[in-house]
Swiss-Prot record:
EC number per UniProt: 3.4.11.2
Signal sequence, renumbered to the chain: none
Subunit structure: Monomer.
GO biological process, one term: peptide catabolic process
Protein name: Aminopeptidase N
Function according to Swiss-Prot or TrEMBL: Aminopeptidase with broad substrate specificity to several peptides. It has more affinity for oligopeptides than for dipeptides. It plays an essential role in the metabolism, it may be involved in nitrogen supply or protein turnover.
Length: 846
């Protein structure tokens, strides 16, 4: 049922908010006055978990009704027009990282608490009565009093104006949506700097971390703001930009205007323990949130069905920004590895959501944050659009968009209009097929009787209903003489031989630089030509060959055995991008390989041979001056070499562990997870698991925590696994924000999978209570869908989750997971014998 839009009866202009918060009792006392235009004599405001003592309108006490089911308070004001409605109420801090909530941490054994906020998507109503809809923009005058102790500070969207008897009064905000209001208070340390234009930038964290961990995020934040001000040709509109790392945080980060909050692992970088990958990850997260300060905050989607306007764009701009700031990182390679790969896999399942999807009820909003679609696919579409328009027109169109719609709300067509006005191209016509339709096409390229035939149809992994969808496909070819777009089902280009001669006889490939959202099925001589030139191709094209052939095999268009046969073509590759593509393909092939089988021995041998040259080249030790690509590649090479049972690698891993066993954090960060994993696999020691868990609890290094949790999940000891699962109930050991990741590490390993699955089913009610509404909640639906591969597990999954299909927040994820498991089971059944044979044959020949 469609939810009511409360802005239709009341349009807010200003909120005056006073909050008195007591950390010890976890109680909130609130006073809020909302000034705006009443369009009816009875108006409603969003409120959830608020207990009202008094409501006034036109300075007179008035009647009200609390409607818990619709999360509303209905107020009878008696007349229409401009009015101030005031509320006095009480509430409690939440325990699910939504609304106003506590974050817990320790410093030198002393337990401490921060208070922070998370109001996106519709959780401002848990803190104060409001029109909690993105279109209902207003200004906010915030005042906060709390049980202040020595060393405490408070930060918010705007600078603090004054402090009166412990009441912190902040400057009025600019006009913005309710979900962007934020504040954090507690004992925080910080470092500050300024941009060239004078914006004050600060990085904040608890004293559980070294101050040095603030240097990298502060530098990236300053340079990112400077980049965006120049690229957007629009000044950053606030006096400051605060970046706060919170010990407990539901998602990765939140773009609160001027007061951005982060999960600690997404912001802090310890210079003594940081890998190049962790730096790149943190930098792109910060750049993503800062992109939102314009696209999402200054200009905001009108309703949640255009959430992609926020997330797709910011996900694209984080790479544009980092490519400009750190060109040696080659971040577009990372884009292909992560975003493109994620989008292509998820978007190939029938029933997947489109980028733009109708939202009728707030409970559905959580399903929109599908990272593979709204973030990854959406950003891939923005990359495609930027290439089609050219960067100059793309940037100029954005500048026009911000100028035209600043402090307002938009729909997707408003962006297309601005880009079209600058470029002269029909952007809406080009983009609608991509944004409004689910899925993507496979473009088949073949030569028949000297005619090149290019055709498109929707690509499915697993069963899918072909509805005849067509896309405006940018061919982005390396040849001249071909059309720019494939908009029809098929195009035929005669005179192929002459066309090839005109292009110097080089092999034809499409989708240059992997910038458009489709894959290619090269038939016959076209594939043979491409593979014959593989060594001279660009790295991204080599990656695409691996990517596309893997997906075609996954869909049953070709056999995985055919994919195994092309692996020897990639034994000499030194590129991080190509070797990552190789690693991803190997992970897919592991589905077919039974543990402790003859095929596994052959597969291990094959993997070892594929990575042997890079193992000899890179070894275990970082070399001064080596490229970011080599530093990133080392971990992949070592992991695959150890999988191959290479004796030298296993000996060296054990030696490194022995050297650092008294201080595991001192293992060089780029090889640390490899060493930690190997020691558990080699010893299968319950005592070592205990050591890892004790280290996990004590360390404040968030990346190190992840590594330790991944390593302990490799244990093959039923008693220890049961203890690990039981520890998820203790927030002093595993924080609620980390349960999903820790549990998945156990679920994905064959030995512990049954126990992890049984634990989920037995603890579903408590998970729902603890994490319901949290962005990690549906991971407990999605992760089994990404993992299970047998008919028995499919039946168990359906038996457990099909009764939960009425839950709108989980419905799509359940349906998608069932289709994914079904397809995986069918794939293994149909191709296992051929794949096993191909692995054995190639391993002997290589």
């Amino acid at each position: 049922m469609a939810v009511k839009r409360l802005i239709e009866t009341f349009v807010p202009e200003n909120y005056k908010i006073f909050l008195d918060i007591d950390r010890k009792t976890k109680k909130i006392k609130g006073q809020v006055a909302i000034t705006g235009e009443a369009k009816d004599t009875v108006v409603a405001f969003h409120a959830k978990g608020l207990h009202f003592n008094k409501v006034r309108a036109f300075s007179v006490d008035t009647n009200f009704i609390e409607n818990e089911e619709d999360e509303e308070i209905v107020v009878k004001i008696g007349e229409t027009g401009r009015v101030t409605v005031s509320f006095e109420y009480e509430a409690e801090l939440t325990d699910n990282m939504m609304g106003i909530y506590p974050s817990y941490y320790e410093v030198n054994g002393e337990k401490k608490m921060l208070i922070g906020t998370q109001f996106e998507s519709h959780f401002a109503r848990q803190a104060f009565p409001s029109i909690d809809e993105p279109e209902a923009k207003a200004t906010f005058d915030l005042s906060v009093k709390f049980d202040e102790e020595e060393g405490d500070i408070i930060v918010s969207n705007m600078p603090e104006l004054l402090n009166i008897n412990g009441i912190h009064v902040f400057e009025r905000t600019v006009k913005m949506s309710s979900y962007l209001l934020a504040f954090v208070f507690g004992e925080l340390q910080y470092k500050k700097g300024k941009t060239k234009s004078g914006v004050e930038v600060g990085a904040f964290a608890t004293k559980a971390h070294s101050q040095a961990a603030l240097d990298f995020p502060l530098d990236i934040a300053i340079r990112s703001i400077e980049f965006y001000e120049d690229y957007y040709q629009t000044p950053y509109p606030l006096p400051h930009s605060w970046h706060i790392a919170l010990p407990d945080f539901s998602s990765g980060a939140m773009e609160n205007w001027g007061c951005i909050t982060y999960r600690e692992v997404c912001m802090l970088v310890d210079p003594e323990n940081a890998t190049i990958q962790s730096k790149q990850y943190v930098a792109t997260v910060i750049a993503h949130e800062l992109a939102h300060q314009w696209f999402g905050d200054l200009v905001t989607m009108q309703w949640w069905d255009d959430l992609w306007l926020n997330e797709s764009f910011a996900n694209n701009m984080e790479y544009v920004c980092m490519d400009a700031l750190e060109p040696s990182w080659n971040v577009w390679e990372s884009f292909s590895i992560s975003e493109a790969n994620m989008a292509l896999n998820r978007d190939a399942t029938d029933g997947v959501q489109s980028v733009h999807v109708e939202v009728t009820h707030p409970d559905e909003i959580g399903t929109l944050f599908d990272p593979a679609i709204v973030y990854a696919k959406g950003s891939r579409l923005m990359v495609m659009l930027r290439k089609w328009l050219g960067d100059e027109d793309f940037a100029a169109g954005l500048a026009l968009y911000f100028k035209r719609h600043q402090y307002g709300n938009t729909v997707g067509d408003n962006l297309w209009d601005a880009l079209a006005e600058v470029s002269g191209k029909d952007v809406a016509a080009f983009m609608h097929s991509w944004v409004n339709q689910p899925g993507y096409p496979v473009v088949t390229a073949e030569v028949v009787d000297d005619t090149l035939i290019l055709s498109q149809k929707q690509f499915f992994v697993g069963e899918g209903v072909d509805k005849g969808r067509l896309w405006n496909v940018p061919l982005n070819t390396n040849w001249t003489g071909l059309p720019d777009l494939l908009s029809s089902e098929k195009v035929e280009i005669p005179g192929f031989a002459a066309l090839k001669t005109k292009n110097n006889g080089k092999a034809l490939f499409l989708n240059d630089a992997n910038m458009a959202h489709y894959i290619i099925d090269y038939k016959g001589a076209l594939l043979t030509d491409l593979l014959s030139e593989v060594e001279s191709l660009e790295n991204v094209t080599k990656f695409q060959i691996l990517q596309d052939r893997k997906l075609l095999a996954k869909a049953g268009v070709i056999s995985y055995a055919d994919v195994v046969n092309i692996l020897p073509s990639f034994t000499n590759e030194e590129s991080y991008l190509v070797n990552t593509g190789l690693s991803q393909l190997i992970s897919e092939l592991e589905l077919f390989v039974d543990e402790d089988s003859e095929t596994e021995k052959a597969f291990q041998s094959l993997v070892g041979k594929l990575f042997a040259k890079n193992y000899a080249r890179l070894g275990w030790d970082k070399v001064a001056g080596e490229s970011a690509g080599d530093e990133s590649l080392r971990g992949i090479v070592l992991s695959k070499t150890l999988y191959s049972e290479n004796a030298d690698a296993k000996t060296k891993a054990s030696q490194i562990f022995a050297t650092h066993k008294e201080n595991l954090a001192s293992i060089p960060a780029d090889i640390r997870p490899i060493v930690l994993n190997n020691e558990i696999k080699t010893t299968n020691s319950a005592e070592l698991v205990k050591t890892y868990r004790e280290t996990y609890i004590k360390t404040s290094l968030q990346e190190f925590k992840r590594e330790l949790e991944g390593a302990v999940a490799l244990i093959k000891d039923e008693k220890v696994i049961a203890e690990l699962l039981e520890s998820f109930k203790n927030a002093d050991i595993v924080k609620p924000q980390d349960i999903a990741f820790s549990w998945f590490y156990l679920l994905r390993n064959d030995f512990s999978q049954d126990a992890a699955w049984a634990w989920e089913k037995a603890n579903w009610a408590s998970l729902e209570e603890k994490l319901g509404g949290d962005m990690s909640y549906d991971k407990f639906v999605i992760y089994p869908g990404n993992t299970f591969k047998t008919a028995d597990k499919l039946a168990e999954y359906k038996a457990f989750f099909e009764p939960k299909l009425e839950n709108q927040g989980l419905k799509r994820s359940i349906e998608m997971a069932i289709k994914q498991i079904t397809a995986r089971v069918a794939l293994i059944d149909s191709q296992k014998a051929a794949v096993d044979k191909a692995i054995t044959d190639i391993a002997e020949k290589l």
